[in-house]
Amino acid sequence: MSDYGIALGMIETRGLVPAIEAADAMTKAAEVRLVSREFVGGGYVTVLVRGETGAVNAAVRAGADACERVGDGLVAAHIIARPHKEVEPVLTMEQK
């Protein structure tokens, strides 16, 4: 199944615990699919979710709030409503 046209939500954290907390909150808050977790380096972890734009927006908000409750774990939170088709290969590079 192609994810082209489906929203992408991203949360980057300092450490694994805030990342797990964010992933848990995001998947509980809205109908989104957890698609990837990347260890970026230096203790940073990025969590990616996909779904309809409204659901991804709600999920990323919930994930960011959960991260902030854990401590100083939130680095960034961002949503791309419809990633361009040229961006899709970049998103799947690390998953292979």
Curated annotation (Swiss-Prot):
Top-rank lineage group of the source organism: Bacteria
Entry GO CC: carboxysome
Protein localization: Carboxysome
Domain BMC residue range list: 7-92
Pfam families to which the protein is assigned, alphabetical: BMC
Listed InterPro entries: Bact_microcomp_CS, BMC_dom, BMC_shell, CcmK-like_sf, CcmK/CsoS1_BMC
Keyword field: Bacterial microcompartment, Carbon dioxide fixation, Carboxysome
Induction: Induced by growth in low levels of dissolved inorganic carbon (at protein level).
GO term, biological process aspect, one: carbon fixation
General function of this protein: One of shell proteins of the carboxysome, a polyhedral inclusion where RuBisCO (ribulose bisphosphate carboxylase, ccbL-ccbS) is sequestered. Assembles into hexamers which make sheets that form the facets of the polyhedral carboxysome. The shell probably limits the diffusion of CO(2) into and out of the carboxysome.
Family (UniProt): Belongs to the bacterial microcompartments protein family. CsoS1 subfamily.
Subunit text: Homohexamer with a small central pore. Forms a CsoS2-CsoS1-RuBisCO complex.
Comment block on domains: The tight homohexamer forms a small pore which is positively charged.
Protein name: Carboxysome shell protein CsoS1A
Organism of this sequence: Hydrogenovibrio crunogenus (strain DSM 25203 / XCL-2) (Thiomicrospira crunogena)
